[in-house]
């Protein structure tokens, strides 16, 4: 119980602390920052290819990014759960 409360407090701190550390800061994605850095280093650079699908808005782009991350996490945790269950089954036999 004590360990659970400590872990929960750490998670809450990790979620809330960034709001106080970077209060009033601007959130920018890594793609935009990478584009700015490339333009600063090599202004003549031309991309090798264009995206197959360009989302209509930033909200849709965020939704797709979140869905991709959620699906990846689901696959990873399914595999971990499967392996853990298989290990328990083998230990009982």
UniProtKB/Swiss-Prot annotation:
It is a multi-pass membrane protein. Keywords: Cell inner membrane, Cell membrane, Cobalamin biosynthesis, Cobalt, Cobalt transport, Ion transport, Membrane, Transmembrane, Transmembrane helix, Transport. It comes from the Bacteria. Pfam families: CbiN. One of its GO terms (cellular component) is plasma membrane. Pathway: Cofactor biosynthesis; adenosylcobalamin biosynthesis. GO terms for molecular function: cobalt ion transmembrane transporter activity. The chain crosses the membrane at residues 5-25, 63-83. The keyword Oxidoreductase does not apply. GO terms for biological process: cobalamin biosynthetic process. It is found in: Cell inner membrane. Belongs to the CbiN family. NCBIfam families: cbiN, PRK02898.1. Part of the energy-coupling factor (ECF) transporter complex CbiMNOQ involved in cobalt import. PANTHER family: COBALT TRANSPORT PROTEIN CBIN (PTHR38662:SF1). Forms an energy-coupling factor (ECF) transporter complex composed of an ATP-binding protein (A component, CbiO), a transmembrane protein (T component, CbiQ) and 2 possible substrate-capture proteins (S components, CbiM and CbiN) of unknown stoichimetry. This is Cobalt transport protein CbiN. The lineage of its organism: Bacteria, Pseudomonadati, Pseudomonadota, Gammaproteobacteria, Enterobacterales.
């Amino acid at each position: 119980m004590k360990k659970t409360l400590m872990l929960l407090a750490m998670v809450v701190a990790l979620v809330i602390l960034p709001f106080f550390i970077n209060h009033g800061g601007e959130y920018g994605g890594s793609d935009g920052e990478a584009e700015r850095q490339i333009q600063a280093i090599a202004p003549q650079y031309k991309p090798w290819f264009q995206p197959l699908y360009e989302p209509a808005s930033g909200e849709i782009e965020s939704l797709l990014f979140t869905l991709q991350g959620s699906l990846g996490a689901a696959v990873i945790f399914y595999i971990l759960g499967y392996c853990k269950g298989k290990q328990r089954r083998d230990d009982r036999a």
